[in-house]
Amino acid sequence: MKIAFLTAGGIAPCLSSSIGALIEQYATLKPEAELIGYLNGYRGLLLGKSIKFPESAKNNFSVLYEFGGSPIGNSRVKLTNVKDCVERGYVKEGEDPLKVAAEQLKKDNVDILHTIGGDDTNTMAAQLSNYLKENNYDLTVVGLPKTVDNDVYPLVQTLGAWTAAEQGAIFFENIVNENTTSTRQLIIHEVMGRNCGYLTAQTALEYNNSCL
């Protein structure tokens, strides 16, 4: 059995630990499984660039819980943006990125693909799975939803959101402490959130709780 991983979309403080948790489970449930990671998300899949996880990773997975980022890289490449994929040299003119990615998964004999990302990442993963099934290749896709916005319905909590709020509150606390050096400072702490107000609200709550 071959298991593949990729991380894609916007960064969030959960990519490394998510991979670590998956390795931990496979080391227990399927120790004989071969684990690979596509480098820099869907870009690596399109270009056929991957790395094989050494057997030692199955015993040393806990180190991934200590770091942010992604050990296999990340990108925002979208298989549905054909023009961008062609311009960047990920596929040739006239090629369908979805088909190129699917054929690479077949070539690599991948049985299970774990996609760690947001809506776009996991929607594309589902499209890949459907394409392969239509072409008589059975691939199981497991999507792990991560976003600091915590706006993936119907999930109550997405990966990365809590940590982002916690760190935002710590940052604000440090800045507020600096404000005691002057009586003529105005601090505006802007928190991202797109059309969702979760991160702003949760960051404020975390800061308020730290002051109690």
Regions found by a protein language model. Give the residues of each.
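N-terminal phosphate-binding or glycine-rich loops at protein starts, especially the Walker A/P-loop
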Residues: M1-S50
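Short glycine/serine/threonine-rich phosphate/pyrophosphate-binding segments
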Residues: A12-L22, L45-L46, D96-K99, D119-Q127, ...
